[in-house]
A protein has these predicted regions:
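Class I S-adenosyl-L-methionine
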Residues: 1-245
Length: 245
């Protein structure tokens, strides 16, 4: 029997609403990601346990894994159209839906925290993408702390940083996702490094660096090799900015 490409690392309640059952699936163990920007990274998918992701974005149930992220959009179930367009870059009927279906087919075995650490240690690159879909803060912070013990590099982003009480624990795990200069300033005051989406290339060069994997930066690196977006764990002084497309 072949080793699985994915495993279940969490089955429990969303930390965003404290009631909705969610799961976290770790994939990319055997098959490398084909994402040119990120490179070969272990992927982690935060999804609802009982509702397919392409359905959840329309019913609004995705709030249990995405919180109040403005990129969710608003779907009108009565008219069957989006009242507010969904600008999120994740195409949920592709990878997230495939992962959801594979989970319900029983393709992903559940693993212990010790096994998770071993899988990370033995991985080709040891690079982890925290929250390939879904906000990491929907998951208990201890799940990520364990996951990252043996990682070589990681990326992580959250739009829920303003409401998270245990900021000190999260700051080494995620970048605060900022959509305005004001949000970026607030995130920095709270102790987060941030990842700011900006309308042009006018980043504040004294405190921000242009994402090395972006087109504007000449695609100098990939996320799997870079390590800048690892929150305060990266020990980088500057935060990161990228041009919105």
């Amino acid at each position: 029997m072949k080793d699985p490409n994915g495993v279940v690392i969490y089955e429990g309640t969303s930390q965003l609403d404290n009631e909705t059952p969610i799961i976290v699936i770790m994939t990319g163990l055997e098959i490398a990601s084909s994402n040119d920007k990120t490179g070969d990274m272990i992927q982690t998918w935060v999804i609802l346990k009982d509702t397919p992701p392409h359905v959840a974005i329309k019913t609004g149930e995705d709030s249990a894994i995405c919180g109040d992220c403005k990129y969710r959009g608003v779907y009108n179930m009565d008219t069957g159209v989006w009242d507010e367009e969904r600008p999120c870059y994740v195409t949920v009927h592709q990878a997230p839906l495939a992962v959801y279906r594979a989970y319900h087919r029983g393709n992903y075995p559940a693993v212990t925290p010790k096994q998770v650490r071993h899988l990370i240690k033995e991985h080709r690159t040891g690079a982890v993408r925290v929250g390939s879909y879904g906000d990491p803060m929907a998951v208990p912070v201890g799940i990520w702390e364990n996951l990252l013990k043996n990682s070589k590099r990681h990326t992580g982003y959250s739009h829920q940083w303003e409401i998270q009480r245990d900021a000190k624990a999260w700051q080494p795990i995620v970048m605060a996702s900022a959509d305005t200069e004001l949000e970026a300033e607030l995130a920095a005051k709270l102790g987060y490094r941030y990842f700011r989406v900006m309308p042009d290339t006018l980043q504040n060069k004294s405190i921000e660096v242009l994402c090395p994997a972006s087109v504007e930066a000449g695609r100098k690196s990939q996320c799997a090799k870079c390590g800048l977006c690892a929150g305060t764990a990266s020990h980088a002084r500057k935060s990161v900015a990228i041009v919105q497309h």
